């Protein structure tokens, strides 16, 4: 079974594109803030909560402005936003600043079993909710473009003997082997962020 979210598009790109950001630190290391922008834009539409994204339309210009709003909450740093807790605190602070309490955030560490992660991904997508995902190092070079990077998951495809996830980053989407993605073969791992209902 294949499930894909009705995701946001800007200038024919799926999601926000980090390459559009003019500030050097955000252009090079703003991936956490970019995924937070994606998530807020998506939830503002889904939950009809305009204060999450206080701009009239989805455009490159408004994304750049919104990234500037998000930057103080998820400021790029030397080692990146490399712990789920930093992301949870930063985005949680932004949500509180706009009085968004319809949903809450919860992390699932990369040390969790694949089955737990698979259940989390499927349940989130089945609820029409995208997933911020952090990957640190990976032993398989085919994932090198996703190393030390935050990106979004916006779909899954269950095959007979495998499951693929739809990864969204830099305005593009790619279908990835989720079991291989999750099992990095490295000691330190990232994880994913679940978006849960408060009511």
PLM segments and residue spans:
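Active-site-adjacent structural segments surrounding the nucleophilic cysteine of cysteine proteases
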Residues: 1-86
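Solvent-exposed loop/turn segments at secondary-structure junctions
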Residues: 38, 137-140, 171-172
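Non-transmembrane alpha-helical segments in soluble domains
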Residues: 40, 92-95, 122
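Alpha-helix capping at helix-to-loop junctions
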Residues: 45, 93-100, 127-130
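Extracellular-facing segments of soluble proteins and assemblies that are Gly/Ser/Thr-biased and enriched
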Residues: 61-117
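Active-site-adjacent substructure of cysteine-protease-like catalytic cores
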Residues: 111-165, 198-199
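Noncatalytic regulatory segments and standalone regulatory/sensor domains
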Residues: 144, 156-199
């Amino acid at each position: 079974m294949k499930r894909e979210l009705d995701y946001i598009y800007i200038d024919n790109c799926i999601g926000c594109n980090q390459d559009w950001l003019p500030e050097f630190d955000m252009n090079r290391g703003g991936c956490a803030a970019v995924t937070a922008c994606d998530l807020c834009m998506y939830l503002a539409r889904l939950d009809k909560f305009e204060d999450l994204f206080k701009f009239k339309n989805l455009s490159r210009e408004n994304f750049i402005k919104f990234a500037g709003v998000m930057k103080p909450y998820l400021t790029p740093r030397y080692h990146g936003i490399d712990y789920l807790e930093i992301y949870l605190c930063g985005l949680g602070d932004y949500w509180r600043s706009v009085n968004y309490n319809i949903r809450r955030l919860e992390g699932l560490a990369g040390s969790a079993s694949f089955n737990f992660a698979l259940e989390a991904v499927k349940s989130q997508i089945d609820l029409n909710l995208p997933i911020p995902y952090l990957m640190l190092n990976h032993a398989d070079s085919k994932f090198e473009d996703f190393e030390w990077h935050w990106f979004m998951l916006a779909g899954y495809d269950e095959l007979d003997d495998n499951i693929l996830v739809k990864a969204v980053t830099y305005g593009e989407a790619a279908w990835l082997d989720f079991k291989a993605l999750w099992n990095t073969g490295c000691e330190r791992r990232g994880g994913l962020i679940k978006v849960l209902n408060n009511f």
